[in-house]
Amino acid sequence: GLLASLGKVFGGYLAEKLKPK
């Protein structure tokens, strides 16, 4: 659903933000 899609996108965004370059 929409929430699941948003959660996946937000989770990926957080992972990229927190992941050391």
Swiss-Prot record:
GO CC field: extracellular region
Gene Ontology biological-process annotations: defense response; negative regulation of nitric-oxide synthase activity
Keywords tagged on the record: Amphibian defense peptide, Secreted
One Gene Ontology MF term: nitric-oxide synthase regulator activity
Tissue-wise expression: Expressed by the skin dorsal glands.
Annotated compartments: Secreted
UniProt keyword Ribonucleoprotein, yes or no: no
Primary localization: secreted
Function: Has no antimicrobial activity. Strongly inhibits the formation of NO by neuronal nitric oxide synthase at micromolar concentrations.
Name of the molecule in the record: Dahlein-5.6
Naturally occurring in which organism (per UniProt): Ranoidea dahlii
